[in-house]
């Protein structure tokens, strides 16, 4: 049963990673054709399709494009599904609920009862679900602030993206621009690693002490699962970072030859 759980995790990981790796370049090219920086203001992004230059035959317009690490953001989504599968699979090996615990846990929507003890800590909060919806909201907020002319000047994330895109369009040294893109991707990777590590530690610490003492196999299974998820997450972040670097270098070459 434990091996089936791990096989399911690995298959889920490769499924979503393959899908987003194949889909993100097309989405990224489409976004580049819709959004670009304005000539008169470095902090304003025009979202009107009539004001935007097109990318034709692999050539980028000389005014520059707005660079967004869409591959990185969408590439992080598989690991939240991965954590959801891990959380639900780990809970399947727990003991059944008593009627009193089932009645007490039915009043909460985002809590999953794990043990049949009588103390108030017998149910664990599924923080992975809450963090997943928070991540989706964060994505919506970032893209809204980035592509809105009213909020761009007051948002640090959007300003950093605009500076990065400005360096793409105005820099004459390809190596300097490539290093700046790599540094930005590395910073985004570090932020995602830290937030995901906090999620894992929070979910793991939510297991009640009574369950850890009464059923050590549950603690061992969940601990191994969380660590395997972390290892896959870190390895895939490294892969996505190199993928972004080569993709960004391709964009730089297109801008240079346009």
Swiss-Prot record:
Membrane topology annotation: Multi-pass membrane protein
UniProt topological domain (Extracellular) ranges: 86-123, 252-258
Segments in the Cytoplasmic topological domain: 24-64, 145-230
Record has Transmembrane as a keyword: yes
Keywords: Glycoprotein, Membrane, Signal, Transmembrane, Transmembrane helix
Name the UniProt record assigns to this protein: putative uncharacterized membrane protein YNL228W
Note: Almost completely overlaps JJJ1.
Glycosylation site list: 118
Membrane-spanning ranges: 65-85, 124-144, 231-251
Protein's cellular compartments: Membrane
GO CC terms, sorted: membrane
The organism of origin for this protein: Saccharomyces cerevisiae (strain ATCC 204508 / S288c) (Baker's yeast)
Main localization (coarse): membrane
Signal peptide: 1-23
